[in-house]
């Protein structure tokens, strides 16, 4: 009978185990894919002391236990050793045909992962506590709650791919961010009817900002996203059917300059009805457009909202415009100032106003271009004490 192998301490070694002349233990095995693999450790059992000068790591028997479990569960021993950066790159490669804005978000997250210690970690070593600590580090870097949540959602999706590919068992990013960070996102507040009228009256009579009256009125009366407004061309206004056709948006970046993209969501492609007042505003915009050289972007031209050089305005132009308008208004109305206003405030106001008038939720969802009815109902449609009172009186009466 062949004598069983023993280590330097006289202990019997199991099948596949051996000890090198330098004292280090080795375990040889065949993984789930038929490949010969090796693992090493300075300790045979968990109770063995770590040799002086060596790093504290799992013992050989602990490694064997994990290996056997992986083989039984069909876990890819090679795949689980890919880094988080490699996993995220793998996910992106599987869905390469995305919008430019999505690609920019991907590039930002990949850059953040490469700069953070978590990006170089093998995915089988990442625990929920590691993912939560990553979220805290992102907050310390100044990223907003929504940005961190979006990135966390992307990494959660990446780990689901790893689970499906039998690389890991659990998803460390499967937790609510609110468990770790306070949601400090400011609630979107609609303008009151009094504030809306005050804003329009001020712009209409101001010697500097009166030329932007129609832009602001159209935003308030259509609820368009600012990128949708900026992308409007002459061909998008259907005066006969009294609708504005939304099938694209205009964006601009430092790297790419101007570019056209499809609407934010599939539901974003829509036709928004126009009131008589809004039709007249569009007619004035067309009439006063500056004469300039034709300017085309991705095959589209004759943009409605352009600067003196004939180039389309973009979101940042309107964001800065509202900062200046509100600043000047509040300078002359210190007792009743306007709140911080952005183009999205006007979209929010439009939606809230229609909801308060009991518009059919599905119709409102269509006009707003929301992908989900819950967005329409829970995110945009804010009740007020006035509408609440009128509803109580209507129902009780």
Regions found by a protein language model. Name each.
Residues 232-290:
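Conserved tyrosine-mediated DNA breakage-rejoining catalytic core shared by Y-recombinases
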């Amino acid at each position: 009978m062949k004598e069983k192998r023993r280590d330097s301490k006289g202990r019997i070694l199991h099948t596949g185990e051996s000890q090198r002349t330098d004292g280090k233990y080795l375990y040889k095995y065949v993984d789930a894919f038929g490949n010969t693999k090796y693992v090493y450790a300075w300790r045979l059992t968990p109770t063995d002391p770590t040799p002086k000068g060596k790093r504290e790591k799992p013992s050989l028997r602990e490694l064997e236990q994990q290996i056997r479990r992986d083989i039984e569960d069909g876990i890819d021993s090679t795949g689980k050793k890919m880094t988080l950066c490699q996993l995220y790159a793998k996910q992106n490669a599987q869905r390469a045909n995305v919008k430019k804005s999505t690609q920019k978000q991907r590039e930002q997250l990949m850059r953040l992962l490469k700069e953070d210690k978590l990006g170089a970690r093998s995915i089988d070593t990442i625990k929920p506590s590691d993912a939560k600590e990553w979220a805290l580090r992102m907050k310390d870097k100044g990223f907003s709650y929504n940005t961190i949540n979006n990135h966390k959602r992307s990494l959660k999706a990446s780990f689901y791919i790893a689970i499906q590919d039998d690389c890991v068992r659990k998803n460390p990013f499967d937790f609510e961010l609110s468990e770790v960070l306070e949601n400090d996102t400011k609630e979107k507040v609609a303008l009151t009817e009094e504030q809306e009228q005050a804003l329009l009256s001020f712009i209409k009579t101001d010697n500097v900002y009166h030329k932007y009256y129609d832009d602001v009125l159209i935003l308030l009366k259509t609820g368009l996203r600012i990128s949708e407004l900026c992308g409007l061309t002459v061909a998008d206004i259907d005066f006969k059917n009294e609708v504005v056709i939304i099938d694209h948006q205009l964006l601009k970046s430092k790297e790419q300059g101007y570019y056209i993209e499809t609407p934010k969501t599939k539901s974003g492609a829509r036709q928004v009805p126009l009131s008589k007042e809004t039709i007249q505003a569009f007619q004035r915009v067309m009439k006063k457009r500056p004469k300039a050289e034709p300017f085309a972007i991705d095959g589209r031209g004759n943009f409605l909202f352009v600067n003196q050089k004939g180039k389309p305005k973009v979101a940042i132009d309107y964001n800065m415009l509202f900062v200046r308008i509100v600043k000047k208004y509040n300078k002359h109305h210190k007792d009743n100032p306007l709140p911080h206003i952005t183009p999205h405030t006007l979209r929010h106001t439009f939606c809230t106003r229609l909801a308060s008038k009991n518009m059919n939720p599905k119709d409102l969802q269509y006009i707003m271009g929301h992908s989900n009815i819950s967005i329409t109902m829970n995110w945009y449609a804010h009740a007020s004490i006035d509408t609440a009172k009128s509803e109580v009186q209507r129902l009780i009466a």
